Amino acid sequence: MAQIPAGADRPGKLSRKQTGDAWELKARRWLEGKGLRFIAANVHGRGGEIDLIMKDGQVIVFIEVRFRQSSRFGGAAASVTLAKQHKLLQTAHLWLARHNGSFDTVDCRFDVVAFTGNDIEWLKNAFGEDA
């Protein structure tokens, strides 16, 4: 039996996952243009997911990618809640442990790449361990 593709209930529209993947790829390419090197995408851990992991010089950068059509409800950057920050921190901690590292031994930061309409905003060090 054939499977119904995601988003098939909305002909001509992408599923949420397809839309997210497209914006994450756009963010990755944009950041590579800024000199960052790609390490991994869509890294899962206990209840959380890191959209992109990249390297900026010697710094490991955990990146959350957000998109909003408009800033009517606060824009993309405002959508990274404290709860979301905690999930990202937990997932980063697990990823570092899997790679024989920790927040104490590896220089890292948490960035947000926010697309609001056609605007892009790169928030370096958007939050940290004390979130």
Swiss-Prot record:
UniProt xrefs under PANTHER family: UPF0102 PROTEIN YRAN (PTHR34039:SF1)
Organism: Enterobacter sp. (strain 638)
Chain spans, region Disordered: 1-20
InterPro entries (UniProt xref): Restrct_endonuc-II-like, tRNA_endonuc-like_dom_sf, UPF0102_YraN-like
Family, as annotated: Belongs to the UPF0102 family.
Name by which UniProt lists this protein: UPF0102 protein Ent638_3585
Molecular function GO terms recorded: nucleic acid binding
